[in-house]
Amino acid sequence: MSEIKDIVVQGLWKNNSALVQLLGLCPLLAVTSTATNALGLGLATTLVLTLTNLTVSALRRWTPAEIRIPIYVMIIASVVSAVQMLINAYAFGLYQSLGIFIPLIVTNCIVVGRAEAFAAKKGPWLSALDGFSIGMGATGAMFVLGSLREILGNGTLFDGADSLLGGWAKVLRVEIFHTDSPFLLARLPPGAFIGLGLMLAVKYLIDEKMKKRRAETAPSAVPAGETGKV
């Protein structure tokens, strides 16, 4: 149970692929103009990570070490192709919005890195959990950044959610404030860089506060030689 908890905590927070490892920044900065796009690409990446880790782990005993990387890339490409066809079939609007960034998941360092660092050494179910946790950590970072940019840039939240979830999701659209002059900086790539920098700063402050709190609550160590003295 402690290993499972550690995998989840590492993926979601301590070793977050976007906020700690700073991997996959190209789609993170390019696609997060809205919360819907960010959520769509994040969930697609999570599905690819989970299935890839599961497959790599299941085949690890029969994968020659000398050619393991090309095999991993073939597995990832196959999974990404399947996910791309699913999105094209059931969420065509989202497919058009994400464009080239769906097939580019194949080259994402997060996917190849987890296959090599974790899935090739652990069992299938732990590997699948690792992929899911890493993917959800990246999805969370994308969603927060996409939400901030959409709110500041358009004054809305979940605009176009029906392209991801279907027609019923139109009711999820929220107009937080009305503006005739959108805040363009938030919608452009420089705004994504600034938003990511602010998120990194907030995470650092939270980590430092948690570290200080643990240090204050930890029992003080008894100096050597002091035991038994009156």
From Swiss-Prot:
**UniProt feature coiled coil, ranges:** none
Name where it's found: Cell inner membrane
Q: Which UniProt keywords apply?
A: Cell inner membrane, Cell membrane, Electron transport, Membrane, Translocase, Transmembrane, Transmembrane helix, Transport
Identify the EC number(s). 7.-.-.-
- Assembly behavior: The complex is composed of six subunits: RsxA, RsxB, RsxC, RsxD, RsxE and RsxG.
Give the family, as the similarity comment puts it: Belongs to the NqrDE/RnfAE family.
Return the protein name: Ion-translocating oxidoreductase complex subunit E
Gene name tied to this protein = rsxE
